From Swiss-Prot:
Keywords: Glycoprotein, Ion channel, Ion transport, Membrane, Potassium, Potassium channel, Potassium transport, Transmembrane, Transmembrane helix, Transport, Voltage-gated channel
Protein family membership: Belongs to the potassium channel KCNE family.
Species this protein is from: Mus musculus
One GO cellular component term noted in the UniProt record for this chain: voltage-gated potassium channel complex
Glycosylation site list: 8, 28
Membrane topology: Single-pass membrane protein
Induction: Up-regulated by lipopolysaccharide.
Residue ranges annotated as Cytoplasmic topological domain: 57-170
Chain segments carrying region Disordered: 1-29, 121-170
Entry function: Ancillary protein that functions as a regulatory subunit of the voltage-gated potassium (Kv) channel complex composed of pore-forming and potassium-conducting alpha subunits and of regulatory beta subunits. KCNE4 beta subunit modulates the gating kinetics and enhances stability of the channel complex. Associates with KCNQ1/KVLTQ1 alpha subunit to inhibit potassium currents.
Subunit structure: Forms heterooligomers with KCNA3, inhibiting its activity by impairing localization to the cell membrane. The stoichiometry of KCNA3 and KCNE4 in the heterooligomers are 4:1, 4:2, 4:3 or 4:4 respectively. Increasing the number of KCNE4 subunits steadily slows the activation KCNA3 and decreases its abundance at the cell membrane. However, a single subunit of KCNE4 is sufficient for the cooperative enhancement of the inactivating function of the channel. Interacts with KCNQ1; impairs KCNQ1 localization in lipid rafts and inhibits voltage-gated potassium channel activity.
Protein known as: Potassium voltage-gated channel subfamily E member 4
Amino acid sequence: MLRMEPLNSTYPSAAASSSPLESHVPSNSSGNGNEYFYILVVMSFYGVFLIGIMLGYMKSKRREKKSSLLLLYKDEERLWGEAMKPLPMMSGLRSGQVPMMLNMLQESVAPALSCTLCSMEGDSVSSESSSPDVHLPIQEEGADDELEETSETPLNDSSEGSSENIHQNS
């Protein structure tokens, strides 16, 4: 085989090694250990950096959750406080007089309301039993009965296999 000689002849061509490619590759056996150590150091820095980011994110989420729960609690407390407020005091009335006045108002309004409902029911019942309303549905039913009789007659005559036609023919 042919061997290529390097252009720069600073290396002895045949004295140091048997092939020219092996002479250009550095042979540091201790360099491999340093490379692994360098990779380990860089990866550990990345790991510490990522763990710091994760912890900061988790801490901010925990704070956000606590603050939102606190805000939710305060909102609900405010709503319950508004709902549980006592009735506003009227001028010159004590709090014991207000419910008594409401009871009296209910007692006077309830009979009037029931009478109004009864009179409305009476009006609707009387309108249902009035003569024009009653005659109109009866007239419609009568018209429907006449239509059914006229429609049945041609069907029986035109149907050849009906039982009536068979009895009439025999």
